[in-house]
C-alpha cells in the first residue's frame, strides 16, 4: 500500500514475461514496523492476518509470495521464526516463509532479454540492508540491471545504511539525515541520472533530500519497456 506505483510496475513487467499476479486484497502491512516500535504482538497479529490472506492462494497453486520491498520480504521470510510457538499458525508460517520471494529472485531466472528494454540511463544502485544483509541478495539487482543494459556507476561503501532503517529516520532524525547525506554523496559521485533501490523505506528517505531522483528499480524496467513511459 505504501508503493502502489512500484507494485503496478512489477505486475506489468511480470505480465510481459508470462507470469500472472494475483493480488491478495486482505493482506496488509507485514508487521515489521510494529517490531521496530517494540509492539511485537501487534506485529504477530499482522503476520497471522497476512497468512490467512495468502493461504488460500497457496492452496490454489500460487508458486511464490512476491515482495517488492526488501524490508517486507526479509520480515515475511522470518514469519516461521516469529510464530514458531503458535500451535495454530506455526506450520502455515513455515510454508508462507518458504514461499516468500524478493522480486529479483523471480526475475533473475526469467528470459529478461525478451523484454526488449531501451536502457540508456546511468544508474547508481543503493542496495538496502534488508536485501544484502538480511536476505543475502547483495549484487542480485545490480546483475539484472547490467544484464538488461543499464549503466551502473561505481558506488563506494555499498554495505552502509542510508539511515532509514525502519523507523530510525523518525526516532533518530538528526543521525539518520547524516547517514542519508553520506550515502547520497557516495551514490552521486558517479553523476547518475537516477538512483535506484529496492525498498520503499530507503527510497522515501533518500528521495526526501530533494537531490538526485530515487526510484524503485522495477519502475525503471517498466519505464524502459517498449511502449512504456
Question: What do these predicted regions represent?
Answer:
Residues 1-229:
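Iron-sulfur cluster-binding electron-transfer modules in prokaryotic oxidoreductases
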Amino acid at each position: 500500500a505504501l508503493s502502489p506505483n512500484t507494485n503496478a510496475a512489477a505486475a506489468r513487467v511480470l505480465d510481459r514475461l508470462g507470469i500472472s499476479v494475483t493480488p491478495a486484497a486482505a493482506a496488509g502491512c507485514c508487521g515489521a514496523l510494529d517490531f521496530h516500535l517494540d509492539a511485537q504482538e501487534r506485529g504477530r497479529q499482522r503476520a497471522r492476518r497476512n497468512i490467512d490472506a495468502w493461504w488460500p492462494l497457496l492452496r490454489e497453486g500460487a508458486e511464490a509470495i512476491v515482495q517488492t520491498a526488501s524490508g517486507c520480504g526479509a520480515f515475511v521470510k522470518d514469519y516461521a521464526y516469529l510464530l514458531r510457538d503458535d500451535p495454530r499458525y506455526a506450520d502455515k508460517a513455515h510454508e508462507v516463509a518458504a514461499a516468500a520471494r524478493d522480486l529479483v529472485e523471480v526475475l533473475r531466472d526469467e528470459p529478461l532479454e525478451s523484454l526488449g528494454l531501451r536502457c540508456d540511463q546511468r544508474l547508481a544502485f543503493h542496495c538496502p540492508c534488508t536485501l544484502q544483509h538480511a536476505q543475502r541478495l547483495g549484487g542480485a539487482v545490480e546483475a539484472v540491471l547490467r544484464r538488461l543494459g543499464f549503466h551502473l556507476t561505481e558506488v563506494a561503501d555499498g554495505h552502509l545504511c542510508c539511515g532509514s532503517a525502519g523507523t530510525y529516520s523518525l526516532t533518530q532524525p538528526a543521525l539518520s539525515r547524516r547517514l542519508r547525506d553520506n550515502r547520497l554523496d557516495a551514490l552521486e559521485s558517479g553523476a547518475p541520472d537516477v538512483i535506484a533501490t529496492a525498498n520503499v523505506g530507503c527510497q522515501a528517505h533518500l528521495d526526501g533530500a530533494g537531490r538526485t531522483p530515487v526510484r524503485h528499480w522495477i519502475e525503471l524496467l517498466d519505464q524502459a519497456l517498449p511502449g512504456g513511459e
